[in-house]
Amino acid sequence: MSKIIDIKTSIIKIPLKRTFITAVRSTNHIDSLAVELTLDNGVKGYGVAPATTAITGDTLQGMQYIIREIFAPVILGSDLSDYKQTLELAFKKVMFNSAAKMAIDLAYHDLLAKEQDISVAKLLGAKANSIVTDVSISCGNVAETIQNIQNGVEANFTAIKVKTGADFNRDIQLLKALDNEFSKNIKFRFDANQGWNLAQTKQFIEEINKYSLNVEIIEQPVKYYDIKAMAEITKFSNIPVVADESVFDAKDAERVIDEQACNMINIKLAKTGGILEAQKIKKLADSAGISCMVGCMMESPAGILATASFALAEDITVADLDPLDWVAKDLYSDYITFNEPNIILKDNLKGFGFNL
């Protein structure tokens, strides 16, 4: 196969329609780094990853440095057919930096698919071309949250991810306000983003059970490193508990599985460093009988396309890929149709189907 002869990076900033607020950060735009890999036959592959410093530690400048100074010397001149070995060698040279790894990993997959004249989704083995996403509701006061949930329901979303963890009293009050407000057909996913402690999480679960809400999952209630508390919550809860920030890579997945510290793992490519590591996590989870969902950072439509492609290939049906609802449709209309809540990949894509 062809050899990689050039690597370029560029910064992409995308404005949001509204401010995104969680227990750990607030933002009104998306910062991303794009990577362009060029083969000696002229074919170019693209990957885009978000700089979500509060979660992964990545910064735009740091990602550029890692790619230019650490990854490029390994990648340049390598044969595309040796991509697994090349990426393993490159990624071993630096700890963490998962977003920088994601951008490179995705650019490789874009090249691999283009060389076969197929989409990345088909390269990975996907049969379907659409997946249903929830919509995320930012942290805010109870009245604002209820209104934003109503807006989501009116936009045809049937799964609502409610950000919690910033103010526990508000979170408890919200449950009472939600009771009987929405149809049982609406599934709620509560994501604390590590904002609670063990006692608060147990109290929140007990409060849920007082009401008639259709609660599908509780996501990452406590600090990412508190696996003991995650295990105790999983044992205590009658609602599935999701590990998000606790699982970045396959080693993390092994730990939470061994400790029985979750019922489900949220796979995000910006945490795993791309598709190859995500596949390892999914395989481990399958072997242990643990479910998986896919999620994302507040990231570009290009990143959502990559995650949707992975999810479709792995038959993952629980998805939190709603940044498409936060940005202008013309940013992704060439490769995705978004009929809320359905994300539909366009037919006849080559690679991911986007150019930068």
Swiss-Prot record:
The keyword Kinase does not apply. Its EC number is 5.1.1.-. Coiled coil: none annotated. GO terms for molecular function: magnesium ion binding; racemase and epimerase activity; racemase and epimerase activity, acting on amino acids and derivatives. Mg(2+) binds at D191, E219, D244. Its cofactor is Mg(2+). Binds 1 Mg(2+) ion per subunit. Keywords: Isomerase, Magnesium, Metal-binding. SUPFAM superfamilies: Enolase C-terminal domain-like, Enolase N-terminal domain-like. InterPro entries: Dipeptide_epimerase, Enolase-like_C_sf, Enolase-like_N, Enolase_C-like, Mandelate_racemase_C, Mandelate_racemase_N_dom. The keyword Transcription regulation does not apply. GO terms for biological process: peptide metabolic process. Substrate binds at R25, S136, K161, V162, K163, N193, K268, C296, M297, M298, D320, L321, D322. Gene3D superfamilies: Enolase-like C-terminal domain, Enolase-like, N-terminal domain. Part of a large, functionally divergent protein family. Protein modeling and substrate docking was used to predict the substrate specificity, prior to biochemical analysis. Catalyzes the epimerization of dipeptides with L-Glu in the second position. Has epimerase activity with L-Ala-L-Glu, L-Pro-L-Glu, L-Val-L-Glu, L-Thr-L-Glu and L-Met-L-Glu (in vitro). Belongs to the mandelate racemase/muconate lactonizing enzyme family. PANTHER family: O-SUCCINYLBENZOATE SYNTHASE, O-SUCCINYLBENZOATE SYNTHASE-RELATED. This is L-amino acid-D/L-Glu epimerase.
